[in-house]
Each structure stands twice: as C-alpha cells, then as structure tokens.
C-alpha cells in the first residue's frame, strides 16, 4: 500500500513539473537570455556555474524555501497568502515578478485536475513555488521529493534555454544535469531542514541581468 502511494506521488510530481505541463515555462529564462547575450554564459561550464550559484545563493534557493513554506501551509489560507506575498516582494525585477505570478496562476489552473479537499488556496493567484508547494503538500507527495523535482525542473529549463540560445548542445546539457544530481539533492535536503529565516540571495549579476532583459530589443523569451 505504501509502495502504491509512493508511486502515485512520483507520477504526480513528474507530471506537474514536466515541460508538457501547461504553465508555459518554456517561454521564460529568468534573466539567463540576457546573461547569454552579455556573454556571461558562453558554454556548458558557464551554465553549470550560473545554475549552481542560483541554487546555493540566489533566487532558486529562495524558491525552494518558498515551496517548503507552501507545502507546510497547504491547509492554512492566511499563511499561504503571506508566503505568496513574500515571494512577490522578493522578486527583484518586473519580469521576475511576472514570471513567478503567471507560472503560479497557470499551475493552479492545471493542477485543478487533482482536486483536494484540504487545499486551502485563496483564489487562483499565487507565486509559482508557493503554488507548487501547496498542491504537493495537499497530496502529501513528500517535501524533499517535491523540492528535488522542482529544482531539477528549474535547472532543466535553464538547460533548455541555453540549447535554444545556441550556447550548448543537447548532449552537454544532459551531461550537466547528470553532474548536478548530487547538488540538487543536497539543496533539496537543506531546504527541507531550513525555514523562511534562511531566505537570502547574493547573486547581483543575475539580478541585473533580469533587469536589463526588460529592454533587450531582440529576444526569444519573456524574461
């Protein structure tokens, strides 16, 4: 019985965080397109360093903590509202704010195919990591598993952006994902044990890239 529940949770996480899930994540780069344009990321090694820095010290780390808060607060509407508002406040640019809010709205709409009575999400608008955490929490997928799946999907999307911008190929991109498995797992474990008191970022170059992308003339991505 427990094995069946674990398999069901795995299938749900794979589906919810698949590129095929209709949230439109393919259209966002989180400022990576600007970094590529500015030649801050020119190949697979640069891409890995960019992703690892965001995982350890940047927006991806903060998103992990916000997901964990959404997971724990899945049946507490007031706490979910506060978490989502905090996520909005942490968005360092107009485009980052747009990305997290539109992804969150689309995720909640699509996740409606998995309704749950205990999910107390007010309205249909929330920051993306909080929305993912709340839905995963309502369905008891396991917090660390949800974090690992979310972080892996985030890094996978960055690889997809880099491939489409022509700075790495598919083979090198997949190789990077393989090499980052331990890092992703370690960050997921650390985020499970952390709290909102551990929020914080020190990735100023990534923040500036997101801001500069707002005036990038020729672009493939919305952010």
From Swiss-Prot:
One of its GO terms (cellular component) is cytoplasm. Coiled coil: none annotated. It comes from the Bacteria. Its main location: cytoplasm. InterPro entries: UreF, UreF_sf. One of its GO terms (molecular function) is nickel cation binding. The keyword Cytoplasm applies. HAMAP family: UreF. UreD, UreF and UreG form a complex that acts as a GTP-hydrolysis-dependent molecular chaperone, activating the urease apoprotein by helping to assemble the nickel containing metallocenter of UreC. The UreE protein probably delivers the nickel. This is Urease accessory protein UreF. The gene is ureF.
């Amino acid at each position: 019985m427990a094995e069946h529940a674990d398999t069901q949770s795995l299938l749900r996480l794979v589906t919810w965080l698949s590129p095929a899930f209709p949230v439109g994540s393919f259209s966002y780069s989180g400022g990576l397109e600007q970094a590529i344009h500015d030649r801050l990321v020119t190949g697979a090694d640069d891409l890995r360093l960019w992703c690892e820095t965001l995982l350890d010290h940047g927006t991806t780390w903060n998103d992990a903590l916000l997901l964990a808060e959404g997971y724990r607060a899945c049946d507490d509407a007031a706490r979910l509202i506060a978490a989502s508002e905090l996520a909005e406040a942490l968005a360092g640019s107009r485009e980052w704010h747009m990305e997290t809010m539109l992804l969150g709205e689309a995720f909640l709409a699509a996740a409606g195919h998995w309704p749950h009575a205990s999910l107390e999400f007010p309205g249909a608008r929330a920051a993306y990591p909080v929305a993912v955490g709340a839905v995963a929490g309502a369905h008891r997928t396991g917090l660390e598993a949800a974090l690992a799946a979310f972080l892996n999907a985030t890094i996978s999307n960055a690889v997809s952006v880099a491939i489409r911008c022509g700075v790495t190929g598919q083979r090198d991109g997949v190789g990077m994902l393989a090499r980052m498995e331990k890092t992703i797992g370690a960050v997921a474990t650390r985020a499970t044990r952390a709290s909102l008191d551990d929020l914080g970022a020190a990735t100023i170059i990534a923040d500036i890239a997101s801001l500069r992308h707002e005036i990038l003339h020729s672009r493939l991505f919305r952010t």
